[in-house]
A protein has these predicted regions:
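N-terminal alpha-helical modules
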Residues: 20-128
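Bacterial N-terminal signal peptides that target proteins for export
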Residues: 1-8
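N-terminal signal peptide c-region/cleavage motif recognized by signal peptidases
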Residues: 15-19
Length: 128
C-alpha cells in the first residue's frame, strides 16, 4: 500500500511537471527550441502513420515504389528548402533550432494533409 501511495505521488508530480513544462514554451530560447522540436516529432509520427496507411492500401508494387520515391524526394526537397530559408546552424545562433523545426514542421503539416487525402480517397481515380 505504501508503494502504491508513493507511486501515485510520483506520477502526480510527473504530470504537474509536464503540464508546467508545456506552459513554458515561451520562457526562454532553450524552451522554445525544445517545444518546436517536440511539435516536429509529433508531426513526423503522424506523417509516418499516414505514409504507412497509404502504402498498405496500394496493391501495385510499381505504385508502392512510386510513392516511396516521391516521399524520399519530398524529404530531400523539404530539407533543402529549409536550409535555404533558415540557413546553416553556424550562421544563425541559438534561434536556429527553433527556426529549423518550424520550417520542417510547416512543410510536414502540408505533406500530412496530402497523405491524409490519399488515404481518404478510395474512389476511382485515386492512387491505388
Amino acid at each position: 500500500m505504501k508503494y502504491s501511495i508513493t507511486l501515485l505521488a510520483a506520477l502526480m508530480a510527473l504530470g504537474i511537471g509536464c503540464s508546467a513544462q508545456a506552459e513554458d514554451c515561451n520562457a526562454n530560447q532553450a524552451s522554445m527550441n525544445q517545444c518546436a522540436s517536440q511539435d516536429l516529432a509529433a508531426l513526423d509520427t503522424e506523417l509516418n502513420r499516414q505514409y504507412k496507411a497509404q502504402m498498405s492500401w496500394l496493391k501495385d508494387p510499381a505504385r508502392k515504389q512510386a510513392l516511396k520515391e516521391a516521399q524520399v524526394k519530398w524529404i530531400a526537397f523539404r530539407d533543402a528548402d529549409c536550409l535555404y530559408r533558415v540557413g546553416k546552424a553556424e550562421d544563425s545562433g541559438s534561434i536556429w533550432p527553433l527556426l529549423q523545426s518550424q520550417c520542417l514542421a510547416e512543410h510536414t503539416r502540408v505533406r500530412v494533409k496530402e497523405l491524409k487525402a490519399y488515404v481518404a480517397c478510395r474512389e476511382e481515380g485515386c492512387p491505388r
